[in-house]
């Protein structure tokens, strides 16, 4: 994505998740982050926010609720009922962090 720090994103997101209360081991946390980032990017491509190469197309096509639902759908595959509260907490922190970052770098404006 234009201007998006792909290499720095996992560490930035991990800090947000830890502040929100995520306590799992680093490898599990980063696996969650990788899956969430991939699902978020998939949503943005499907919504017309990004093109296939990752270039930013149209920020007006971004819908935060739809993005959250798409990421949740990808993350909850295979998750058991007991894992859902922690998953939802991490999803909320992930989306807050991502949207704030996209606004900060000027890709989104609400």
Locations of regions flagged by a protein language model:
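Hydrophobic membrane-targeting and insertion signals
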Residues: 1-19, 109
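Amphipathic alpha-helical binding modules
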Residues: 72-110
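Conserved aromatic-histidine-acidic binding/catalytic patches
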Residues: 1, 25, 83
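Alpha-helical polar/charged "hotspots" used for coordination or helix-helix interfaces
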Residues: 5, 19-20, 40, 98
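Amphipathic alpha-helical interaction modules
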Residues: 21-68
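An amphipathic alpha-helix signature
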Residues: 6-14, 30, 34, 38, ...
